[in-house]
């Protein structure tokens, strides 16, 4: 979405329009779209039922966490960089699911079915949100190559990434105003040859003010996995 900040008599306020659940459903219903994901990103902390922190290898025990609708469509999984090795992906009907890496699960004695509590900032009055680990992923990379195990854009080791249900992230970030709103979403199409026509149909949805949003085509995932999959999809952002 587009927008920014402006000032008025009562201070500064956001001019950005965010993506609503209704918009997601309308776009997902367009013929030719096979699935979508939408995310909210934050760096919460997780705690075991004993009250002990779920620890990382970093200076703090926070996890770089995506609050997701459908983790199956996240580009880290779709491109093959992450592989779900236990449990299931987070889906739209899950409200409290959590996926963590095998490294952090083993370090903390956690497994699929373990209960944890998520808090965006445990040093404030942020709410405690009950979650359950539904999946465990492995970073598919050369573990001797530091560049493939670390995301320079976020400064987080990939093993300290996590994925939770969008509803759980919204609950954790309830004190942060626009911090729990969706700013972007990714949609997959079933046939790359129909990409342009699908985009045109999406942009013809009259209930969405397209002056406030940018639509781009991105085939990175398609290029990365087209040789491995027979039903490869192409990404629309």
Say what each PLM segment does:
Residues 1, 226-237:
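Hydrophobic alpha-helical transmembrane segments of multi-pass inner-membrane transport and secretion
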Residues 218-228:
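Alpha-helical membrane-protein architecture signal
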Residues 2-220:
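Basic-flanked hydrophobic alpha-helices used for secretion and membrane insertion
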């Amino acid at each position: 979405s587009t927008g920014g900040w402006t000032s008025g008599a009562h201070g500064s306020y956001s001019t950005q329009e965010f993506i609503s659940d209704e918009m997601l459903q309308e776009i997902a219903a367009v013929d030719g779209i096979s699935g979508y994901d939408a995310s909210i990103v934050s760096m919460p902390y997780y705690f075991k039922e004993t009250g002990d922190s779920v620890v990382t290898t970093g200076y703090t025990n926070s996890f770089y966490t995506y609050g997701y609708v459908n983790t199956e469509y996240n580009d880290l999984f779709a491109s093959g960089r992450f592989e779900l090795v236990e449990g299931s992906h987070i889906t739209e009907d899950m409200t409290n699911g959590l996926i963590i890496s095998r490294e952090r699960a083993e370090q903390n004695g956690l497994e699929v079915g373990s209960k944890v509590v998520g808090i965006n900032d445990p040093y404030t009055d942020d709410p405690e949100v009950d979650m359950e680990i539904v999946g465990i992923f492995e970073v598919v990379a050369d573990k001797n190559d530091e560049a493939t195990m670390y995301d320079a854009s976020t400064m987080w080791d990939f093993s300290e990434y996590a994925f939770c249900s969008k509803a759980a992230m919204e609950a954790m970030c309830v004190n942060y105003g626009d911090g729990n709103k969706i700013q972007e979403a990714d949609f997959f199409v079933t046939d790359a040859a129909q990409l342009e026509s699908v985009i045109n149909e999406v942009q013809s949805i009259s209930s969405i003010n397209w002056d406030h949003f940018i639509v781009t085509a991105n085939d990175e995932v398609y290029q990365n996995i087209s040789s491995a999959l027979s039903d490869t999809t192409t990404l629309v952002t």
